Amino acid sequence: MKNHILNHLPYKSSFRFVDNISRLTEDEVIGDFTLKEDAFFYEDHFAGNPITPGVIITEIMAQIGLVVMGIFLILKDTELNFDEDNDLFPLLTSTDVSFFKMVLPGQKVTVVSKKQYFRFGKLKCYVEMLDSTGEVVAKGMFSGIIKQVDGLKK
């Protein structure tokens, strides 16, 4: 099921921030991503001393912590068989994130997300990002919806 979920992520390789999903239940998802040292956003942020932009940290947290879980819950709760012409499109509706540590190029991060609620198509999760030592890099609340979009091209 985890690989099936990853196949539904609507991102191409340069903006897909999910390497692995190690746990996936109705209430929790745990996944990781290793930031590539040659990622496009490091060249200018900050030149000569690159760090991962907060918007990228937020995006990693959203992709693993909200989108993966949302797709899982929708596929689990419906009898819909999504294919290339009937894809799922995630829409982030709100975030409230606090940052505690820098994330450097080449660093592996783990995202842990716990569902707060999923009703009427809206998912809300408490999401934490941890570094390789288990220290919290960022944490916050994420909300979003996932819609079916016919003919969405990847």
Regions found by a protein language model. Give the residues of each.
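Short aromatic-glycine motifs in intrinsically disordered, low-complexity regions
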Residues: M1-K12, E84
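HotDog/MaoC-like acyl-thioester-processing domains
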Residues: M102-K154
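Hydrophobic/aromatic beta-strand elements that line small-molecule binding cavities or substrate pockets
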Residues: D19, D96-V97, V127
